[in-house]
Amino acid sequence: MSLKLMRTVALALAIVAAPAMANEEAVKAMEEYLDFVDYGGATIFPEQIPKEDWKRFYVIDARDKDQYAKEHIPGAVNIEWRQVLAKRSSIPKDKPVLIYCNTGSLSAQAGFALRIAGYDNLRILQGGFAEWKAKGGLDAATRASGQARH
């Protein structure tokens, strides 16, 4: 086999092997996460958060900037779901983090990525902004307990 052909084959193998190794590392990280997390452990319902507890969360609105500008949970910061890893240095690890989107599906993906990146202090708002709003927003816990009467 000629030296040129051997170099070409070696380069081709390196190109093919690198993504395979990177993918294997990602799979291992996901396996470790799935072994660690408990069912439902990352989700929280709007009615589980008393009004006075909202201020202790770092709240991330994972929707796009136009949806955020139109309406969002008071105190929330806008980090679109695709950008959570790129902007993770602005997300605290020393306080509870709550992440939401419209329904919970995109925020669940963002939350999964953050957990793989080492964030174990976060919760996904089950049902997202739509359910939070439908259940009474910041007053969802009070409504659920039957204390709010209209």
Model-derived features: positions:
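Short, surface-exposed ligand- or partner-binding patches at beta-edge/loop junctions that are enriched
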Residues: 100-101
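Bacterial N-terminal signal peptides
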Residues: 9-18
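Rhodanese-like catalytic fold shared by cysteine-dependent sulfurtransferases
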Residues: 2-7, 20-47, 54-57, 65-96, ...
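Active-site flanking residues adjacent to catalytic metal/cofactor-binding acidic residues
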Residues: 60
